[in-house]
Every structure is written in C-alpha cells, then in structure tokens.
From Swiss-Prot:
The chain crosses the membrane at residues 44-64, 75-95, 131-150, 164-179, 194-210, 235-255, 266-286, 318-338, 365-385, 388-408, 423-443, 450-470. This is Cystine/glutamate transporter. PANTHER family: AMINO ACID TRANSPORTER, CYSTINE_GLUTAMATE TRANSPORTER. GO terms for biological process: L-cystine transport; L-glutamate transmembrane transport; L-kynurenine transmembrane transport; negative regulation of ferroptosis. GO terms for molecular function: cystine:glutamate antiporter activity; L-kynurenine transmembrane transporter activity. NCBIfam families: 2A0308 (TIGR00911). L-glutamate binds at residues 135, 244. It is found in: Cell membrane; Cell projection, Microvillus membrane.
Length: 501
C-alpha cells in the first residue's frame, strides 16, 4: 500500500540532483568516492534493532526514581504486578507495530501508519507537534539527566552548578547530533555498546538482589499486598507511570527502510527487546525491595545509589556514570529514530524538502538530524520542560492508539494485504483500548494540562492548511524557498534520495 506524496516533495528542475557517482554536480571535478546510489542503506541488523529498542526504553528512571508506580499502588506486591502488566501490554503494542511494520514497509512509525489509514491531516498534526515541541523537549530532558550524572562524581560534597550541567548537556547533545550525521554504522555500533552498559548496570543491581533473596532477605515481601493506604482510584495513575516507563518500543518502526530483512528482523527484535526489558524492570524492582523498604524507596531521590551504597560500598560511585551512559544511549537512539520520522514526513510533503535529502557520501539524512539541534538548544535554555512534556503526554498515546486502531481497520478494509507477521485481533484491540484509557486518564487526572496540550496540538490544523493545502503562495516566497534549499544543499552536500519508495 503506497501513497503518493501530498505535494511534490522533490523538484524536477529547481534543486540540485545527485548523479550516479553519488555527488553534487557543483562540488568540483574530484574523483567520485564510489558508484553507490544516494539512498539510506539497510544497515540495521537484528542486534542493532534490539539495541535501538532497549536503548531508547531504558533511560534514567529505573535507576533514579522508579517510585511513581509504588506511590500510587501503596504496596510492594501491587507495584510489581503493575510493572508486569504494563510490560505485557507494551508487548501487545509492540507486536501490533510489528504487524504494521511488516505490512507497510516504510519508515516513519505512527506518522506513516496514520497517513496510510487516516489521511494527511492527522499525520501532519502528529509530526508538527513532534518536531516543534515534543522531541526537542524530550531530548533536552534526558540530556539534562546525562549532564547531571556525568558531573556528579566531580561534585560529591557540593551542589552541581546549574550552568555547568547545561553546558555539559549542550556538549552531549552536539556529540549525538554529529555522530548521527556522520555515520549510520558508527551510531549503531555505539548504541550497541551503550545498550550493553545499560544491561550491565541492571545486572549489577539484580545479581546482588538475587543473592539477598538467597540469604533470606524477604522481609519486605511479607504481606506484599498490604501497606500504605491507597485508594483504588489511584491505580490508573500507577498504570500510567508504568506504561510511560516502557515507552520506546515503537522506535524501530521509525527506521523500517533501513532494517535488514524487516519481515523477520522487526518482529524478532521487538520480542527479544520487550522480554529483556520487562524481566529486567521487574527483577530490578524486586532487587531494590530486598534492601530498601517501600517508605525508604519513596523518600530516595536516587534509588540505585541508595541500593548500591548499602550493598556495594565504594562501587556506588560508578552508578552515576552508568546512569549517564544510559541517558546518552536514550539520546542517541531517539535522535537516530526520530530523524527518520522527519525525513519521511518531508518526503511526503509535510516538512521542508531539504529534510528529505541525504548526504552524498555518508548516506545519512543529515538535514533531518541537525534540524533537532537548534530546537533542542532552545528548549534546553528555556523554561520548565517537564510541564511542557506533561501538557503533551496525552498526545503520544492518542496517536499511537490511532496507529494501532488503523491495523484493525486495515484487517477489514484490506483483508488481502500481504501480512508476513500477523497477530490475533484481540491484541491490537486491547492495546487500542489501553491507549484510549490513557488519554481519558489524562483528561480526568489533569484536565488543565491536557487542555493546554490539546490547544498546542491543534495548532497543527491551521498550519496544515497554511503550509500544505494553500498552493497559491506569493512568487517571492517560492523563489526564496528554492534559493534557501539550493544553498543548504551546497553547504550540507545533500541531494534527493534515488529510487524512493
């Protein structure tokens, strides 16, 4: 099922085109670097796919403050139950995306699936709010955690200056952008290494926890389902925190066109990753409770540090480094995946054409990567990022739910579509209901923030009609746009992709 772009995304004469040697015609007469076509290569193997999913799901939260679930359940047993249920439901969502990714073999994730099923307007609104607010703010938040924890070993006895955190954060963001601009292979290799660091950090917590259980340290699990008074009405909020902790399983679908043998790799990578993350999350929480009781966990600002100080002695000094590496992995994986979302949206005519162009030698979507840098820097040095993300958290579940509902629609509308991987219908149905529940919960628990988020999201509607539908733009605007694009092509050494889908 292939759509035509909403508008023409690549000029037939106005913009510079790459030649068969993979170079811009205006870059001189040097010997061409090779005969490869200018296009994104399929370099994402099974191992790299697993590292993208695990690397973007596991951030700082499980090490620093996994208390949102416990706070709203009131008992150790119920919190572990919620962690398990959320892992299973996230697996259902991931399996639904595996079917979508092997049926619609295009990059872009939920943007592409919404575009294919529901049309250009909701797809544009999705990418509009993602580009301008959600992704820059989310990248800035995880990057600030990286900056704080990479500096913590140097400021053990005093408070870390806020300016120092932001400066080292800015350096980290720049390194990630440069890395993703220079090489897909190196970005993927570093992601594998960082994922290994994350899993090592989790094992450093789980193994001593298991040893504590063997020694009989089970006092915090006695009467596991009794504890602080907690209303059953707060369980949905605990569920919300749990689902948020697993978010990230959808990122491999953002890079479908770069996955080797996607019909096999995507489902297998998703199943392996979700099994590892779910087991890791549950066992990490079990390990915490072998040493820290519920009240202490709720009071701790860095649970992994508290745990390691009690069991690992001086080795606890290494925990901030592992947390920083975990954050860096989330930064790298997020930028790698989301840049492909912008690339595909540009190819479909929803973003400026320059974002759908590829570097002539490095074969990376350079403009789609670097566009995030100034936007993230603005967010980094601006106001309250957490509030901004809270305003828009409902939008994530709304659009993911729409994408999975689209799977159900395609089952009935296009029953003969080739589906290499097919899930039982109750899986997408249950997950779509879960997403609807998350949106309803946002409206119920915080109507003010959700209302602000709705207004911000809906600004994409007039933007769609102004920038996409209105085709009688002034001549001076079209000329200026073309000149800017040509200039950026020459500076960045990028051209339209050859043999696009």
């Amino acid at each position: 099922m292939v759509r035509k772009p909403v508008v023409s995304t690549i000029s037939k004469g106005g913009y510079l085109q790459g030649n068969v040697n993979g170079r811009l015609p205006s870059l001189g007469n040097k010997e061409p670097p090779g005969q490869e076509k200018v296009q994104l290569k399929r370099k994402v193997t099974l191992l790299r796919g697993v590292s993208i999913i695990i690397g973007t799901i596991i951030g700082a939260g499980i090490f620093i403050s996994p208390k949102g679930v416990l706070q709203n359940t009131g008992s150790v047993g119920m919190s572990l139950t919620i962690w398990t249920v959320c892992g299973v439901l996230s697996l259902f969502g991931a399996l639904s995306y595996a079917e979508l990714g092997t049926t619609i073999k295009k990059s872009g994730g939920h943007y592409t699936y919404i575009l294919e099923v529901f049309g250009p307007l909701p797809a544009f609104v999705r990418v509009w709010v993602e580009l301008l607010i959600i992704r820059p703010a989310a990248t800035a938040v995880i990057s600030l955690a990286f900056g704080r924890y990479i500096l913590e070993p140097f400021f053990i006895q005093c408070e870390i200056p806020e300016l120092a955190i932001k400066l080292i954060t800015a350096v980290g963001i720049t390194v990630v952008m440069v890395l993703n601009s220079m090489s897909v292979s190196w970005s993927a290799r570093i992601q594998i290494f960082l994922t290994f660091c994350k899993l090592t950090a989790i094992l450093i917590i789980i193994v001593p926890g298991v040893m504590q259980l063997i020694k009989g340290q089970t006092q915090n699990f006695k009467d596991a389902f009794s504890g602080r008074d907690s209303s059953i009405t707060r369980l949905p909020l605990a569920f919300y925190y749990g689902m948020y902790a697993y978010a990230g399983w959808f990122y491999l679908n953002f890079v479908t066109e770069e996955v080797e043998n996607p019909e096999k790799t995507i489902p297998l990578a998703i199943c392996i990753s979700m099994a590892i993350v779910t087991i890791g999350y549950v066992l990490t929480n079990v390990a915490y409770f072998t040493t820290i009781n519920a009240e202490e966990l709720l009071l701790s600002n860095a649970v992994a540090v508290t745990f390691s100080e009690r069991l690992l002695g001086n080795f606890s000094l290494a925990v901030p480094i592992f947390v920083a590496l975990s954050c860096f992995g989330s930064m790298n994986g997020g930028v790698f995946a989301v840049s492909r979302l912008f690339y595909v949206a540009s190819r479909e005519g929803h973003l400026p054409e320059i974002l759908s162009m590829i570097h002539v030698r490095k074969h990376t979507p350079l403009p789609a990567v670097i566009v995030l840098h100034p936007l993230t820097m603005i967010m980094l040095f601006s106001g309250d990022l957490d509030s901004l993300l809270n305003f828009l958290s409902f939008a994530r579940w709304l659009f993911i739910g729409l994408a999975v509902a689209g799977l159900i629609y395609l089952r009935y509308k296009c029953p003969d579509m080739h589906r290499p991987f097919k899930v039982p219908l109750f899986i997408p149905a249950l997950f779509s209901f879960t997403c609807l529940f998350m949106v309803a919960l946002s409206l119920y628990s915080d109507p003010f923030s959700t209302g602000i988020g709705s207004v911000i999201t809906l600004t994409g509607v007039p933007a769609y009609y102004l920038f996409i539908i209105w085709d009688k733009k002034p001549r001076w605007f079209r000329i200026m746009s073309e000149k800017i694009t040509r200039t950026l092509q020459i500076i960045l050494e990028v051209v339209p992709e050859e043999d696009k889908l």
